[in-house]
Regions:
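Active-site-proximal segments of metal-dependent phosphoesterases and phosphodiesterases across multiple
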Residues: 42-50, 82-123, 160-161
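Active-site neighborhood of phospho(di)ester-bond hydrolases with catalytic His/Asp-centered motifs
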Residues: 5-7, 31-36, 66-72, 102-105, ...
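Aromatic-residue detector
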Residues: 12, 28, 34-35, 78, ...
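Conserved beta-sheet core of the metallophosphoesterase superfamily
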Residues: 107-182
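Beta-strand-turn-beta hairpins that frame and shape the catalytic cleft
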Residues: 1-3, 92-102, 143-150, 171-175
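Core catalytic region of metal-dependent phosphoesterases/phosphodiesterases
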Residues: 2-95
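Short, well-ordered coil/turn elements that cap or connect secondary structure elements
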Residues: 61-63, 88, 96-98, 124, ...
Length: 182
């Protein structure tokens, strides 16, 4: 299976439209959204074309393929307008080989700084902790937890490392895809 992984949209209609175009091109089996979908948050600047009401139908059109977890900027009111479950702090997927992918935003389970996993749950060797929250791309083995892959797709709309991005998981491997701005 092919998973497209995105995080931290923060209500940007422009970047959500770009993401939908990428989804149409990539043709993933499932879309993983790691939280912070509609609200920009009190510490972030407004993203380009901040329009949560325009983001809602774009995401709802993909609801049957979305697996989502709650970010620190997501609330019950967001769940009222989105057609897919959003309020879980984590979800677990297993790929074709049985590898566990632990999906979380990162504010509750373990992604404080760049690759900190101090609050990560115990995961079997060979698992992956897939998280957002920091707006910084990561794809590396954990130094603190041997056998644990850390993957952060970066931010769709407010990157803190210079490039808008999402991730792909396919064939047991993670990769980043940079989104270009018009």
């Amino acid at each position: 299976m092919k998973y497209l992984i995105a995080s931290d949209i923060h209500g940007s209609a422009y970047w959500t439209e770009r993401l939908v175009t990428a989804i149409e091109s990539e043709q993933p089996d499932r879309i993983v959204l790691l939280g912070d979908l509609l609200y920009h948050g009190p510490r972030n600047d407004l993203p380009r074309d901040y329009a949560p009401k325009r983001v809602i139908p774009l995401l709802n059109a993909l609801a049957d393929r979305i697996i989502a977890v709650r970010g620190n900027c997501d609330a019950e009111v967001d769940q009222m307008v989105l057609d897919f479950p959003l309020m879980a702090d984590y979800a677990t997927l297993f790929d074709e080989t049985g590898r566990e992918l632990f999906l979380t935003h990162g504010h509750v389970f373990g992604a404080g700084m760049h690759n900190s996993v101090d609050h990560a749950p115990a995961l079997p060797e060979g698992s992956a902790l897939v998280y957002g929250h920091t707006h910084i791309k990561v794809n590396e083995e954990s130094a603190a937890h041997p056998g644990l892959r850390l993957f952060n797709p970066g931010s769709v709309s407010i990157p803190k490392d210079g490039s808008h991005s999402y991730g792909i998981y396919e064939g047991g491997a993670f990769r980043h895809v940079i989104m270009e701005e018009d």
